[in-house]
């Protein structure tokens, strides 16, 4: 309970924010606002650099079963900014060793009180923030390609907020179960009195997959959801982005051990792109739950094959934009352009498909043609990415070579089947001359090319799609979400009746809708404690951050009952 009391005020404030859905965070949203920021950033950078091996591989020491590398060491991370290997190798443990250790670790952890577990995990959050935030920021930046600011905010403090938010719901779900009850009723002339005891029983070992582009944002809350409910977690990072999760696992283990619990509640399972072990982990007989964030293909395989384990998935889909009518077209296009560029559209919430009536978009100055809308949007994107210094802040770097190959392929397809409104090209990053970069690709197509845009095209790729009219645009967009998945949606209309139709249609399709938003806030920004991320209603994922359903099925309730004893007897026991 010591840690819970230490963090009680922060936790209770988080509970209040979840109840009201208001804006709150205990963490500064910009690196410069972090306490003693210059010193903290310098220390984080130095710590990150100390991990690097350079020409000679350097072992990341992780004191876990198999930590000496019983199956050797593995590492293949390459910085998207330098295109040089990080030179870090991590111990590869036999999965059976990890499962055995995790299973043994659950006993004392699940026997602790809910508040004790929550307190220890709040201490993990605090330790990550106080001691490792800028180290992880650099690790995220040089494995995913995120900018420094995004790695700090999105993969740092906002991910920590999501972790705390998950703990709030885990606390609520478990405290909803009374630990004991006295039950009495008449059966004929007999009066029956029973003592009932209710126990929270964890499901077992959870596998947590972290993705290549945003490893911590989904993994931290998933880990918290399983651990807070008494389970153990084996983390399976993407081979391209191991370091942020290896640091995280080490911190979890240190805090757990210091609190008197078995650190093997959290371990790291490593694989390579050449020899993946994901399917083996999912189908392992000791796997009770699978948290997966990543590709649509593997996510769908997890959903189909995880049974009898439970699966919690977030993959991707076709995030849609409807342009029906606007008050200020330039403001709308600037906001869209910014969001299309943000982290080179390598986020699961990035918009991709923009549906426009073929007759054009209504504005106070009259109808703007379909062709002009596309051209002005392309021009807005080009303006944002023209200056390398500005492009570096917003586009950052491209995580993988596969994305560049996809850009080339889609550009060729677009030229054959539609029109290339904006061709991609590398830009010169002002700090990292070798950075893997690209400006966005924008294609203009008709709905006849649905096979071209009817899936996530990962990276800075967007489609301006001609629809028969506004009603057809709404029907096409929401059908694509239902069929192919979609996490976010954006509607621009001055017609309240149309907005009402769109709200209902998108709610039924299961995409989180933003209406008529312009200005400084990125359109796809999702606020912890307030915004729900994923609905579970379409193929883009079956779980949501965060509400009770994300945590409540990670534990079960068992009970025992017996004839009521005299008060002194129960007190003696």
Question: Model-derived features: where do they sit?
Answer:
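N-terminal Rossmann-like NAD(P)+-binding subdomain of aldehyde/semialdehyde dehydrogenases
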Residues: 1-191, 225
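Conserved C-terminal structural/oligomerization subdomain of aldehyde/semialdehyde dehydrogenase
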Residues: 1-13, 111-122, 133, 260-263, ...
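ALDH superfamily catalytic-core signature
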Residues: 2-16, 27, 33-35, 251-260, ...
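Short, flexible turn/loop "capping" segments at secondary-structure junctions
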Residues: 78-79, 313-315, 346-349, 452-458, ...
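Residue-level signal for inorganic ion chemistry
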Residues: 83, 117, 230, 266, ...
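Rossmann-like NAD(P) dinucleotide-binding subdomain of oxidoreductase/dehydrogenase enzymes
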Residues: 174-333, 337
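Short, conserved secondary-structure transition motifs
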Residues: 269-280, 356, 396-406, 522-527
């Amino acid at each position: 309970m010591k840690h819970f009391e230490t963090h009680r005020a922060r936790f209770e404030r988080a509970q209040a924010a979840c109840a009201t859905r208001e804006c709150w965070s205990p963490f500064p949203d910009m690196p410069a606002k972090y306490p003693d920021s210059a010193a903290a950033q310098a220390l984080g950078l130095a710590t990150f650099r100390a991990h690097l091996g350079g020409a000679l591989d350097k072992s990341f020491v992780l004191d876990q079963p198999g930590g000496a590398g019983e199956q050797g060491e593995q590492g293949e991370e390459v910085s998207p900014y330098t295109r040089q290997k990080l030179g870090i190798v991590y111990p590869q443990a036999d999965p059976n060793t990890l499962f055995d250790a995790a299973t043994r670790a659950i006993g004392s952890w699940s026997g602790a009180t809910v508040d004790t577990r929550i307190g220890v995990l709040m201490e993990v959050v605090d330790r990550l923030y106080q001691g490792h935030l800028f180290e992880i920021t650099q690790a995220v930046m040089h494995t995913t390609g995120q900018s420094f600011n995004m790695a700090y905010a999105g993969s740092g403090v906002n991910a920590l907020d999501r972790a705390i938010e998950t703990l709030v719901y885990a606390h609520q779900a478990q405290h909803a179960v009374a630990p004991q009850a006295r039950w009495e009723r008449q059966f004929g002339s007999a009066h029956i009195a029973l003592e009932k005891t209710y126990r929270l029983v964890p499901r077992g070992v959870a596998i947590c997959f972290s993705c290549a582009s945003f490893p911590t944002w989904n993994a931290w809350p998933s880990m918290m959801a399983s651990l807070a409910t008494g389970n153990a977690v084996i983390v399976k990072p993407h081979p391209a982005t191991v370091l942020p999760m290896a640091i995280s696992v080490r911190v979890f283990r240190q805090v757990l051990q210091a609190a008197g619990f078995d650190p093997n509640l959290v371990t790291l399972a490593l694989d390579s792109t050449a020899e993946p072990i994901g399917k083996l982990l999912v189908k392992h007989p000791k796997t009770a739950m699978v948290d997966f964030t990543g590709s649509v293909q593997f996510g769908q395989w997890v959903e189909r094959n995880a049974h009898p384990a439970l699966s919690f998935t977030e993959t991707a889909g076709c995030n849609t934009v409807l342009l029906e009518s606007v008050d200020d077209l330039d403001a709308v296009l600037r906001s869209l352009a910014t969001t299309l560029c943000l982290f080179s559209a390598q986020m699961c919430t990035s918009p991709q498909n923009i549906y426009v009536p073929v007759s054009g978009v209504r504005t106070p100055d009259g109808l703007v043609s379909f062709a002009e809308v596309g051209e002005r949007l392309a021009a807005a994107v080009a303006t944002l990415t023209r200056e390398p210094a500005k492009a570096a802040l917003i586009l950052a770097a491209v995580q993988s070579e596969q994305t560049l190959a996809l850009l080339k392929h889609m550009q060729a397809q677009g030229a054959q089947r539609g029109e290339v409104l904006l061709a991609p090209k590398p830009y010169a990053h002002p700090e990292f001359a070798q950075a893997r970069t690209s400006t966005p690709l924008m294609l203009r197509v008709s709905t006849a090319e649905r096979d071209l845009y009817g899936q996530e095209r990962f990276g800075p790729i967007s489609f301006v799609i001609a629809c028969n009219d506004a009603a057809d645009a709404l029907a096409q967009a929401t059908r694509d979400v239902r069929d192919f998945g979609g996490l976010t949606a954006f509607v621009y209309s001055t017609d309240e009746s149309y907005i009402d139709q769109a709200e209902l249609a998108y709610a039924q399709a299961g995409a989180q809708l933003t209406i008529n938003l312009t200005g400084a806030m990125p359109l796809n920004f999702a606020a912890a404690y307030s915004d729900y991320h994923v609905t579970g209603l379409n193929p883009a994922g079956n779980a949501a951050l965060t509400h009770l359903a994300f945590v409540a099925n990670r534990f079960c309730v068992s009970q025992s009952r017996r004839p009521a004893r005299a008060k002194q007897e129960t007190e003696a026991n």
